[in-house]
């Protein structure tokens, strides 16, 4: 498989065409952003860590029958994935009150939820990726009610697998963001990535943060935090 021309460059990844019409080549970048791109930095090794962690987690999900776009890891920072049309919704599942939910509802960060909360955010940088209801989604015409139901059910299924998997590594899955895409056959599958960029991950005992909040809040060394997650997941740490 060959990497051909650049199709798209986002905040954290570059997407390239391949000679296969149904595959694209993903390259993870060493860039870190927060607050919708207002805070930026280049952090050596971050692309490798996100690629390694995403590979491990997507393989875990595939083992239990959850369909993803992941095909294979190509290098430390690259992977081959199925080409999909991304649904412009971020699907956020929350198990613990943190971040914007804490601010929005005035509830204490760290409070465990009795049942997970699923939220949808409209993917639009100019609008700041606003929180939307199912009625808003219908108005925007970005997904059908049936597709929204599929996204919610998939997010909750993935959440249960991930909670158990991270718990086995002594990590608390606080919340995480998923993106989904539609294949040429019309099937909705998990896309994008699952990494400390897209999850809040706390040590189960100390609540030490091992995610992008380390960068957002200037809490320490981001690569060391991500390396700790990779190590706990059984990956090859480069520390």
From Swiss-Prot:
CDD domains: SAICAR_synt_PurC (cd01415). Signal peptide: none annotated. The gene is purC. PANTHER family: MULTIFUNCTIONAL PROTEIN ADE2, SI:DKEY-6E2.2. HAMAP family: SAICAR_synth. PROSITE patterns: SAICAR_SYNTHETASE_1, SAICAR_SYNTHETASE_2. It catalyses: 5-amino-1-(5-phospho-D-ribosyl)imidazole-4-carboxylate + L-aspartate + ATP = (2S)-2-[5-amino-1-(5-phospho-beta-D-ribosyl)imidazole-4-carboxamido]succinate + ADP + phosphate + 2 H(+). GO terms for molecular function: ATP binding; phosphoribosylaminoimidazolesuccinocarboxamide synthase activity. Pfam families: SAICAR_synt. Belongs to the SAICAR synthetase family. This is Phosphoribosylaminoimidazole-succinocarboxamide synthase.
